[in-house]
Amino acid sequence: MTEPLRIVFAGTPEFAAEHLKALLDSPYEIVAVYTQPDRPAGRGQKLMPSPVKQLALENNIQVLQPPTLRNADAQAELAALKPDLMVVVAYGLILPQAVLDIPRLGCINSHASLLPRWRGAAPIQRAVEAGDAESGVTVMRMEAGLDTGPMLLKVVTPISAEDTGGSLHDRLAEMGPPAVVQAIAGLAAGTLEGEVQNDELATYAHKLNKDEARIDWSRPAVELERLVRAFNPWPITHSTLNGEALKVLAATLAEGKGAPGTILGASKDGLIVACGEQALCLTRLQLPGGKALNFSDLFNSRREKFATGIVLGAAVDAQ
């Protein structure tokens, strides 16, 4: 009887943990899991294990958390595991060529975009922000370059007008794992050929940062509506209202003209705010010290805060 493939898995967030779950249910042997070192989290800044580490420990799998894979000791530790294949999903550490050369069948990666579009750290959010019609998962062979390797398999999903960064993430987290299992079977059988990426079509998905989430009301409403969806659940788009932070969690396009940031009107349906082109109807907001609420609830209890003519973003920056 043929020995099962020996697989080393490397990943960190929940997206990666969903892939590890699928591999644990596959016929392959997961000999070890690599994940990033525990990080401080929450109000107490207590050290917390990654979702991948938690899942590995629950299944009695060896967990390795080197701060880097660039040194000889870390590479020797990996080689000692005698992996046939390394599966990498949102690991967060660079794998040098010396590491890529260790597994017998090389290293493969599950990337949350339709490569070569959106190489890099935030492909899901950038696809929503850009107004892309579709997204998906690409399983590829890894090279030393960032998300540049030959593509083995793609699965595609449309991006709807209601999709947020969170909803698209969750959908891709369901689609990616079976694609990885299918790709591994093809590699093991020697039936899967890689397709070289066209670098001329490549775009780069820069890492998200909070500064980007500050709403610039001079931009067209169509761009801001996509930004609101892309940055939910993190980092959440925001502005200010009478000098207080105002988080914007949902919005739709609306008709209206005025100086950018000016409140044009309010009703139970939403808060209409002028943009550089057209207007935005803010439908879900969060005020300081409160929870996120549909605007209809805020309108009933705090109507005076949203008077026509007030300019959002006119005072201090939101945090």
From Swiss-Prot:
- Residues reported in the UniProt entry to bind (6S)-5,6,7,8-tetrahydrofolate: S113, L114, L115, P116
Main EC class the enzyme belongs to: transferase
Task: State the disulfide connectivity.
Answer: none
Per the UniProt record, which EC number(s) apply here? 2.1.2.9
GO molecular function annotations of the record: methionyl-tRNA formyltransferase activity
Q: Name one Pfam family in it.
A: Formyl_trans_C
- Point out the coiled-coil segments of this chain: none
- GO cellular-component terms in the record? cytosol
What domain of life does the native source organism fall in? Bacteria
Q: Which UniProt keywords apply?
A: Protein biosynthesis, Transferase
Q: Which reaction does it catalyse?
A: L-methionyl-tRNA(fMet) + (6R)-10-formyltetrahydrofolate = N-formyl-L-methionyl-tRNA(fMet) + (6S)-5,6,7,8-tetrahydrofolate + H(+)
Alphabetized InterPro entries for the sequence:
Fmt, Formyl_trans_C, Formyl_trans_C_sf, Formyl_transf_N, Formyl_transf_N_sf, Formyl_transferase-like_C_sf, GART_AS, Met-tRNA-FMT_C
What's its job? Answer: Attaches a formyl group to the free amino group of methionyl-tRNA(fMet). The formyl group appears to play a dual role in the initiator identity of N-formylmethionyl-tRNA by promoting its recognition by IF2 and preventing the misappropriation of this tRNA by the elongation apparatus.
Family affiliation: Belongs to the Fmt family.
Q: Which HAMAP family match?
A: Formyl_trans
Q: What is this protein called?
A: Methionyl-tRNA formyltransferase
Gene name as annotated? fmt
